[in-house]
Design a protein with these regions (language model features):
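A charged, solvent-exposed segment within the mature domains of Sec-exported extracytoplasmic proteins
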Residues: 127-179
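Gram-negative (and chloroplast) outer-membrane scaffold detector with strong preference
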Residues: 58-148
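Short glycine/proline- and aromatic-enriched beta-strand/turn motifs that initiate or cap beta-hairpins
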Residues: 22-77, 175
Length: 180
């Protein structure tokens, strides 16, 4: 029940921030504000007979030409090998991270490549409480001309369950989403 309420709240927040971001760009100045919202779905390679699936909302602020600060919430579902799902198979994490655009777009059609590092930790009560560490490369198009652009992320994630006495989950991840 709590996870569905958090997911609904995150979805409403994403829609609200999307409208703010869409209206914040001025035609005359053609400058975009350095605040963006990303919503994405992700999956990690199976580890210890568990497949993690994620729903992620990321609010990011570009504070310098190539550097960005991220505040993120992730709702994860841990699918066991037998495919059984229960309410206790999920966890909601809150955290943050930093990004560095190492390959800025020279051409509007290419987009930017950003190296990101995140740390999140579980909130609320869950059997899958964890601390998550993510490092990856994310691609996104330019938002100066388009209000909604695709994002793709590839990287490595480690989920530390040491507080619960469970085995850690680690592996490659892929995320697909939209940037507002």
């Amino acid at each position: 029940m709590k996870n569905s309420r958090i997911v609904r709240t995150a979805a409403v927040a994403a829609v609200l921030f999307a409208t703010i971001g869409a209206n914040a760009q001025s035609e005359a100045g053609s400058k975009s504000i350095p605040l963006h919202v990303e919503a994405s779905l992700g999956a990690c390679t199976p580890s210890n007979k568990v497949l993690p699936l994620d729903v992620n909302v990321d609010l990011n602020y570009t504070f310098a030409k190539r550097f960005s600060l991220h505040a993120t919430t992730t709702t994860s579902y841990f699918m066991p090998k037998n495919g059984a799902t229960h309410d206790y198979n999920g966890a909601t994490n809150l955290g943050g991270g930093l990004g560095y655009v190492f390959l800025p777009a020279k051409n509007d059609k290419l987009g930017d490549f950003e190296l990101r590092a995140f740390v999140t930790t579980s909130v609320g009560s869950s059997d899958f409480k964890n601390t998550s560490y993510n490092v990856g490369v994310h691609w996104f198009g330019h938002t100066e001309k388009h209000r909604l652009v695709p994002t793709v992320g590839v990287g490595y994630t480690l989920r530390d369950f040491s507080a619960k006495g469970m085995k850690n989950i680690n592996g490659a991840y892929l995320s697909l989403g939209l940037r507002f």
